[in-house]
Amino acid sequence: MSCCASSAAIMVAEGGQASPASEELWLASRDLGGGLRQTELSVPNAYCGTCIATIEGALRAKPEVERARVNLSSRRVSIVWKEEVGGRRTNPCDFLHAIAERGYQTHLFSPGEEEGDDLLKQLILAVAVSGFAATNIMLLSVSVWSGADAATRDLFHWISALIAGPALIYAGRFFYKSAWNAIRHGRTNMDVPIALAVSLSYGMSLHETIGHGEHAWFDASVTLLFFLLIGRTLDHMMRGRARTAISGLARLSPRGATVVHPDGSREYRAVDEINPGDRLIVAAGERVPVDGRVLSGTSDLDRSVVNGESSPTVVTTGDTVQAGTLNLTGPLTLEATAAARDSFIAEIIGLMEAAEGGRARYRRIADRAARYYSPAVHLLALLTFVGWMLVEGDVRHAMLVAVAVLIITCPCALGLAVPVVQVVAAGRLFQGGVMVKDGSAMERLAEIDTVLLDKTGTLTIGKPRLVNAHEISPGRLATAAAIAVHSRHPIAVAIQNSAGAASPIAGDIREIPGAGIEVKTEDGVYRLGSRDFAVGGSGPDGRQSEAILSLDFRELACFRFEDQPRPASRESIEALGRLGIATGILSGDRAPVVAALASSLGISNWYAELSPREKVQVCAAAAEAGHKALVVGDGINDAPVLRAAHVSMAPATAADVGRQAADFVFMHERLSAVPFAIETSRHAGQLIRQNFALAIGYNVIAVPIAILGYATPLVAAVAMSSSSLVVVFNALRLKRSLAAGRGATPGTLIHSGAVTS
């Protein structure tokens, strides 16, 4: 199928067309660290599970490729590759040639592409042409069926042939190009049986016309193509509708911005050409093009895309802003801190597309089935033809039955069973403020029966307040703040905020996750953290969190803190209970503090004073007991248990390592994102199983009917197209059911009490 790429994209295909230079591909790739890079390519003529297997197989055969994944919904392939293999610098052009050798066009992905709209226009025009031709041929056929004489019948047959031929060539080019491309490279896809069926139907009709036969099936061949094109057009539209969350998010990024040069001159520059360090002017009413830091100006910023909150946030000099946020009231001068491809919007889009392309167990099964389905269909059609020839000896009837079998057994429904649900579910979760980093994570989340939550920053908002500052001397507070500067832990941040500006203390600094900070200075060894870490002993119990400042294990000061639970925490725990899920707390804080919070939230199982290793051990013990646990955590010390869990989640405020380790990231302050994500994932799993049942049930019923000769090619085309649309519409129920009956957002999910087991 031909698709028009943007002018920035250079097509790579057979026929000697120009391809991007190796250096261009290097610049377009993303550095992942560890000698790995990631490149995104568009593959506009990939349609089915066979295409996925072919492209991924061609790339994985390359020693430079670490992994490759095709996203059929966006028709893109993501390649993670090694910068060097055997001391030789990798040439990324090899990846494009490997794809082209399998018969697929490919070009560098450009965020500004609108090929989907062009394809939709081409499909609609093809539907119109085939529909017009089918209508006119049908009128001629009615005259023939009404008892026209032989000469008139032959004339009408020839007129029908002249109408059908160009219509099949023009409107059927989508199927013919794809089928020929597959056959030429020694493989099959779902368009091969369609092209065979349409061609055989037309060929048989032409043979009858030349031989002055009584019956011709030009109307059937063109009408068959008409219904097939309707199905493909609706499928394309439904996929686009399923991806509305991603396309809407992409539109939040402006095309460009005004860049201020050092000499004061201004230039409008495309967003892809903005580099870190550039000074930008963002006027009121404009969206922030890339992540940046405010150099001057004060304004209200709509950050709903970041945190889901409708209330504007005031930003001023020194504050950070994210790409896609809307500047409401005043002009801002920014310094870009990231390129467009590394900014917030690009990161979120990447997460959602990773969710779409994730290889969950069901999707692997569907892809494997679709890969072997096409050869099986051809064999079945051949056996059907041979069988009817042996039974009746009528070539025409045997051929018609074989054509019907070719059409009715198209694996479209099976290939769509999983990915379309993942697309809709990822979009639904995004609308609820939850980012999915891997499509398989939704499947794992639907299986959990236990939720283990960290305390500070997860069950609480992670902004503790120092409550006994009046009891601590300014000198000790300043010393503690100078040590706390080296940590992002919420308690360290609270000490810094209470002390004001503080210069970092000089010395050999070491942060021990789950314990505290140690600084070796000329005066001795300062420690700031838990009592056991700082002074090697226990102290009086209290219901407040504390941090001890010590010098050579001698206590200098005790800092006490209060932290507020996250909004809707208790309601979220109750919602988890209604889902039949047990809850527990994993915390490194003192037992009295954890017990008090657990009691207030109605959680009976809790663990206190745990090290990162002990948290992993608790999670492993739950797994050994047969439980599948979701771990929700935010800190550096939570990263090991997040990776060890069956599935994991972190708030957007989490430390970078925590967000990277988690499978889900929730953007809102409310903990209601947790039951919302579980409910959505469970419902998505139900729809996937339903889609499998629909696809398999369709084949179990339709294939025997076609083999027995009870379905004409036209009926087969209608049935095949309908099966694909049923699967897509069933997936779209996820949007309607959650919005109407199971909570439109995490907040309404909790307040309506709509979570059901």
Swiss-Prot record:
List, alphabetically, the InterPro entries matched.
ATPase_P-typ_cyto_dom_N (IPR023299), ATPase_P-typ_P_site (IPR018303), ATPase_P-typ_TM_dom_sf (IPR023298), ATPase_P-typ_transduc_dom_A_sf (IPR008250), HAD-like_sf (IPR036412), HAD_sf (IPR023214), Heavy-metal-associated_CS (IPR017969), HMA_dom (IPR006121)
A GO CC annotation recorded here is: plasma membrane
Q: Name the residues annotated as catalytic in the UniProt entry.
A: 454 (4-aspartylphosphate intermediate)
Domain (HMA): residue spans on this chain: 37-107
List UniProt keywords, sorted A-Z.
ATP-binding, Cell membrane, Magnesium, Membrane, Metal-binding, Nitrogen fixation, Nucleotide-binding, Phosphoprotein, Plasmid, Translocase, Transmembrane, Transmembrane helix
User: Which residues point to the Extracellular side?
Assistant: 144-158, 207-218, 392-398, 709-713
Top-level taxon: Bacteria
Which Gene3D superfamilies does the protein's record reference? 3.30.70.100, Calcium-transporting ATPase, cytoplasmic domain N, Calcium-transporting ATPase, cytoplasmic transduction domain A, HAD superfamily/HAD-like
Molecular function as annotated in GO: ATP binding; ATP hydrolysis activity; ATPase-coupled monoatomic cation transmembrane transporter activity; metal ion binding; P-type ion transporter activity
One of the protein's GO biological processes? nitrogen fixation
Coarsely, its chief localization is membrane
Give the residue spans that cross the bilayer.
122-143, 159-178, 186-206, 219-239, 369-391, 399-416, 689-708, 714-732
Task: Answer yes or no on keyword ATP-binding.
Answer: yes
Q: Which reaction does it catalyse?
A: ATP + H2O = ADP + phosphate + H(+)
| Membrane disposition | Multi-pass membrane protein
Q: What is its EC number?
A: 7.2.2.-
Where's it found, cell-wise?
A: Cell membrane
An example of a Pfam family matching this protein is E1-E2_ATPase
Q: Where does Mg(2+) bind?
A: 634, 638
Q: Which residues bind a metal cation?
A: 48, 51
Topology Cytoplasmic: residue spans: 1-121, 179-185, 240-368, 417-688, 733-757
The UniProt similarity line reads: Belongs to the cation transport ATPase (P-type) (TC 3.A.3) family. Type IB subfamily.
What this chain does, per the entry, is described as: FixI is a pump of a specific cation involved in symbiotic nitrogen fixation. The four proteins FixG, FixH, FixI, and FixS may participate in a membrane-bound complex coupling the FixI cation pump with a redox process catalyzed by FixG.
For this entry, the protein name equals Nitrogen fixation protein FixI
In its UniProt entry, the species of origin is given as Rhizobium meliloti (strain 1021)
| Record gene name | fixI
